[in-house]
Amino acid sequence: MLAPPGRRVVDSVTVLLPVPPSVNALYRHGGGKGPHKSDVYRAWIDGAGWRLQAQRPGRVPGPYVLLLAVPRTSRMDHDNSVKAVSDLLQRHGVVDNDRNAVRALLEWHAEHDEVAVTVRGLSDGAALEPIAPVRPPLEAVA
């Protein structure tokens, strides 16, 4: 995990990230190595990681709901963005474990060219309520 020490615990995090490669392009096979991260995926992990850290997100411990708003200009199916984004959030300590996601909400947006990612923690015993789509104001994550 690449989380800076002392990342503050918060109830919710919203960040903007570059559009990830499609899940179909994350791994490659061959060269006698078995499955391995593609060059495109490695480049995205590096660039998106720097973008994430620059926004100084807190940490959402325990179970959470993941909301992804993918730009309509993206050429991939929006459900192909979940794995890369979830893995990045775990790698950088925004979530403890991406298996703690109890729900994912995906939607298209036309506001900008990045993926708007919101992680909402579920407090102990909190019921899952219907969630309205969220389009965060850009100034909230700048």
Write out the residue ranges for each language-model feature.
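Acidic, proline/glycine-enriched N-terminal capping motif
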Residues: M1-A142
